[in-house]
Amino acid sequence: MDIRKAYLDFFASKGHEITPSSPLVPDDATLLFTNAGMVPFKSIFTGEIPRPNPPRKTSCQTCIRAGGKHNDLDNVGYTARHHTFFEMLGNFSFGDYFKEQAIAYAWEFVTEVLKLPKDRLYVTVHENDDEAFNLWQKHIQKERIYKFGDKDNFWQMGDTGPCGPCSEIFYDQGQEHFNSSEDYMGGDGDRFLEIWNLVFMQYERSADGVLSPLPKPSIDTGMGLERVTAIKEGKFSNFDSSLFMPIINEISKLCNKTYVYESGASFRVIADHIRSSVFLLAQGVSFDKEGRGYVLRRILRRALRHGYLLGFKQAFMYKLVDIVCDLMGGHYTYLNEKKDFIKEQIRLEEERFLSTIENGIEIFNEELKNTKEIFSGEVAFKLYDTYGFPLDLTADMLREKNLKVDEEKFELFMNEQKARAKASWKGSGDKTASGDFKNLLEKFGENHFVGYEKAECESKILALLDEDFKEVSTLKDAGWVMLENTPFYATSGGQSADSGFIAKREVLDTQKFFNLNLSFIKAGEELKVNDIVHARIDTEKREQIARHHSATHLLHHALREILGSHVSQAGSLVESNKLRFDFTHHKALNKEELESIEKRVNKMIINSSEAILENMPLEEAKKSGAIALFNEKYQGNVRVLTLGESKELCGGTHVKNTAQIGSFYIVKESGVSAGVRRIEAVVSKAALEFVKNQLEELSKVKDELKNNDILSGIKKLKNEILSLKNELKNSSKTELDSKNIQGVEICVKRIDNGDIKAMIDDFKNKFAKAVILLIQVKDEKITLAAGVKDVPLKAGALVKEAAQILGGNGGGRDDFATAGGKDLSKINEALKQSLETIEKAL
């Protein structure tokens, strides 16, 4: 049974709009990852944005819980139901239906669609929620309804805001399979398994803790797909279900070991972690030293360590990507599109860690011998810093031995090297959190962007805000303006904002806050709410931005065509004088690839293709071949831009014809992080400026070479350098005065020219036994070097003694060493002392 499809189809039949899974990287600075089905709808529940139409949605949301407040990483593999990646089925009502229908829908789906036995089902409600208690009695016997307090049956988003009682549906897995004293409703045993949580958001909690009824209460429900699949298939562990067993079987085949549940924690860890890794990489998260990329790295490296326990000594995780795509690519089609890229990224990361894991485990085991209860924080840091062992991986290894790590000491060492990694994820902490945006949305709704059609317009000032985003009635200082209709494009999708004027006030920036388009203006003449003002953008700047933005689309197409379909946008910046495009690719681009890409983009520009803009539903756009970005949230109809062979979803401003772009030059290619490359480029006027600067540089080179033929001048210069090198080499072969003491040839002297190392090497090569110390002065800088051959004397000690006389220091190998000095007046003393030391040693 395809439970995912059955769930979505069921609620679609009840008037719910099916919402595609939102990105794992949420549009929420307080969250590391999307960790619940309601996260994409958070702003609707809090009232920050208006209720959608229709006011009921359903989704199957991909979620990650590994890092931050919601972190299940440590438990994965050791319990039947913890996962770093899971799918959350949910149905949502935004001020539409409430408890009665939510309960009826849930009961109908569980009993008539899933066909779970009614005599195995139990329900919990909040102890004070008599309404829910009575409603449930229409469907289930009173004896099967349990009341619990706030701890179990009250949900809240935070210390303040929407909240309310919740009701949970439980499934009895059978008394015959469990014998724990905690196996009762409300206990901590596994017999009674929660499968669905219905949250009744009916209150608003104020800062002083008072609960006030919401005028339009809402519904938020969540049911884990992995859990309900296991129940439907009669399995006591999610890992024994059809969602995981094909992966576990593949692991078993690769390591040639049989999976047994009781001792199979490593199999389960790997099966879970490969799913997380595949989805995160597919959605643009890359392995990194901090933030989300570091969580991804921790997940994969934890899996690799468990692979090591199963006997894997070579990269193997990448071989599991195919089975994950086979299992989930039917619903999440982008997995198949990204499969080759994902495999390559995982393989490269595996090789990075496998090169150090063995040495790291040896160091871990050595320290383990000296550990009674607490493992050294210093050694844990060494494992992290030198061998790439995340702290939670070390803690995971210690947990198996019932030991703990000294985290305080570890953090101490981490703080001493702040530049190496961040200790925790931090939110944005900006002033917008306390801004008056909710009031503006309630009063006016979203204002209208007219900049696609107009460069200027007359418009009414709906609101004015100071620099702290607080509403004011008049504004002379710098602040924010909300126009009823605005021609100013707000920073979005990588495109920088328009500038221009509102009345006589200069517009420096335009940003979107909760879908409100606000322009930031310099201090100047007083503006008032309800004023009718003239707004106009800087059209020249807009045109240059449009040219660069359209060029990024052509660049994206060229990259996919030349490098492969695994390439996807990982970030962009579009300004009036340059573009920056980040994309997924596993290695640096060579000269030939860059030339091909540049040539391909310019060919598309020359083709003079008309820009075609269309508005259509998201699914229709995807079916048409348009490329959508994971870090963008699409709602309702989407805007599709076709530029020749390029077709993408985009809300930015663009040229009407590719010929308007002019010419395209790649300025730089570089790496951003593991698996992400960056191209910087210029077009149009910026391209002309780039070429002009290049020509000026060439002119300067000609002047320096004193030759109009640059290649000829460089060739001549190279020949001169070669000639000088030969002269220097020959000067190093100058005969050095020496004397023989007991069969050892000795040379101690000051030299003015020559390659000091080459001279010492030549001297040593001439004799069977030799000791040489030379002092050279160049530009007031003293260099010492000593060489020893087949003599019981160390060059390092010899040169160090002489250097100390000269106020310097140094050392090196027994056969060759160098040093530096400062005091020119003591050179003769140093030479004399060195000779005495040599003679004494012989």
UniProtKB/Swiss-Prot annotation:
Zn(2+) binds at H549, H553, C650, H654. One of its GO terms (biological process) is alanyl-tRNA aminoacylation. Its main location: cytoplasm. One of its GO terms (molecular function) is aminoacyl-tRNA deacylase activity. It is found in: Cytoplasm. HAMAP family: Ala_tRNA_synth_B. This is Alanine--tRNA ligase. It comes from Campylobacter jejuni (strain RM1221). The lineage of its organism: Bacteria, Pseudomonadati, Campylobacterota, Epsilonproteobacteria, Campylobacterales.
